[in-house]
Amino acid sequence: LIRRSSAAKPHPLWSLQVMMDEPELVANVHRDFCLAGARVICLNTYSVTRHRLQMGSALPDLPELLKHAGDLARAGIQASGLSGIDIVASLPPLTASYLQQSPLSPEQMKDEYKELMELQRYHVDGFLAETLSSIAEGEAVLLAAQEADTGVHLAFTVQDEDGTRLRSGELLEDALRVCVPLKPLSIILNCSVPEAIDQGLPLLAVATKTFGA
């Protein structure tokens, strides 16, 4: 929705850049989601990680960008005139989406996720780790949440041609075996075609009580 509304040309950090160049657009999108009935909105921070920021230049530092995203979400809620709407922070893949294997070590991933949580924990109502492609990413974010003493909703993306496997090729069943004991608030499937979601959801239903897509 932001991409369709913005005059900016797409590039690897376009969603971040539009937040700086057209902040009112991002706030208005949050407002419109609230007016459409959303009771939880997610910060526009999918590309705000230390490794992704290395692709850009003349950008504010990580804490400032995260704060700016939170301010825009709150402005959108205020503009809607509604109350009782929660804000969650995005915990994305740290380097790029849909990678079979992250170039970062498990310890590096855990530390960076923990930093993102600690920088935002007092400004949001929760955390959504989204579009994770591998067991290592899921385990890292959940271990980081334990160290940060906070909860996190965990969302995996699965292969379009086989919804029982993560984008990494690993079995979704194996991912659940590793991640469910680490007590995510919920486990979700996202950023996959509907047919793949249909294949994966029964595995979630067996493994955990709180799941969705």
Question: Model-found features: residue ranges?
Answer:
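Domain-level signal for soluble alpha/beta catalytic cores
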Residues: 1-213
